[in-house]
Amino acid sequence: MEYEIYCDDCLTKMKEFKDNSIDLVLIDPPYNIGKDKWDKWRSVEDYVEFMGKVFKEIERVLKPNGSFYFFHNDFLQIVELQNWINTNSNFIFKSFLIWNKRYNGSPRKYYFDNV
């Protein structure tokens, strides 16, 4: 089995792929938390609209039994995104995976406090 990993803007990169050609999509999108200029939307609705374009492109490239995962850190926005997915796509939601980071968003000096 052959695997390829791409680190790129997902909307740009996925346009290169044929329909139903990808087994797994894993994205770490902007979180709309406003820390950087590329991570600011006027409203949650605008952010969900942007992410909807991403989800539709993922839906296009995924194989019928493919999977996709995305990271996020704002539960209220996750609910809005899940509502969009349930209403506007054929994806079947399976479960949340929670990665509980002890020092999420903290300076790196706190990452290895057990060393």
Predicted regions and their residues:
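Core catalytic lobe of class I
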Residues: 1-115
